[in-house]
Structures are given as structure tokens and as C-alpha cells.
Amino acid sequence: MNAPVSRMPVPFMGPPILVDKKANFAIAEMPAIILYLGETLDLMPATAALRATTMKIVNDANDVIDEITLDGGRAMWTKKRWQDFTPRLKKWMSLWEETGRRHGLKTASGFLLGGGTPGIADVVTATLWSTMTDRFQKIEAILEETAPMTAALTRRIADLPTLAKLAAKAQQDYGNAYCGGQIEASLRRVLGA
């Protein structure tokens, strides 16, 4: 990040960055990384409409992360700020719930965009919500109440062996940290976590 732009594997301001040494390719920005991984790992849907919807889910997840971290800590959480934000968080959750409903998602079965196997939209959904709900019980309760099918999908996908292994590695490397620093401390304070 501190290197001159001319020496960076790809021009970027900050993480995340993905370097695919096999392909001699680097890319920054979460949505671009997800698109690259989805394409190279053959996890993107077959139709243009479902690929576009997948990228909408990816960008929505990125927006939720920006909002829950108050744009990376431009401000800190207060009880009032959290109370004002909670209806918006519920609306975000309802977007996932309605998307899943429109594609046949049920509490015990199905995937966010339909189909017979999980795709990028499911992995991003599970990663977003499980990372948050594993650390903040109040957010978990809101998700369960507001978007029960999304909560169930999140658990099913997060329990897949590869994602469970990744979550265990993250727990080992980072403990119960969510976003770190003062912003996480303020979030934990307002949520009593």
C-alpha cells in the first residue's frame, strides 16, 4: 500500500487485493475480486440476468460492510446512531430475504438465486452475515427475525467444509475480531458484545 503505484501488482489504495501467481494477475476491490474468483472457479450463474444479480448481491454486501463500519471508521457508533441505523440494517436484510424468496429459497432448502448448487451469491451471503452474526448476538437476533430464510441459508453455506475451515482459520488468526480498531470497539459497546 505504501509502495509507489508503479511497483504495485495492481494500482490500489488498500486491501483487499488478490494476487493470482499462476495466472500472473492481480486485482483489487472486493467486487472485482469476487467476479474474478467466480469466473475462474466456475461459480457464476449461466445467464446474464443471474450474473448481474450475483454482482448486485456482491455490491450490496460491500455496502453493508461500509455501513456497519461507518465507512471504515469516519465516525464511531453511539446508542443513538445504532438506533437510527437498525431500521436500515433490517431493510438490508430484507433485500436478501426477498431475493431468495423470488428464487425459491426456503428455510430448509434452496439457494439465494435458485439452482441446484451454491454459487458466489450464496458464498458472499454466508460470509457477510455469518462473520457478523458469529460476533454480534444482537445482529444475529435481528437477522433471525427479519430474514429467517437468509439466516438459515447463511448457516447451511457457512457449514460447508471449505467455508467452515476458512472460518476456523480466521478465528485462529484473528480471534473474535470483526473490523478492529475504535470502530469495532464502539460497535461492541452499543451492542453489548
Question: Which residues does each PLM region occupy?
Answer:
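GST-like domain detector, emphasizing the conserved glutathione-binding G-site
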Residues: 1-91
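Polar helix-capping/helix-linker motif
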Residues: 2-5, 160-163, 180
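Generic structural signal for individual residues within well-ordered alpha-helical segments
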Residues: 34, 52-55, 124, 151, ...
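Active-site-flanking alpha-helical
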Residues: 38, 128-129, 167
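Short, hydrophobic secondary-structure boundary micro-motifs
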Residues: 44-46, 108-114, 141, 164-169
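GST-like fold's C-terminal all-alpha helical module
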Residues: 56-159
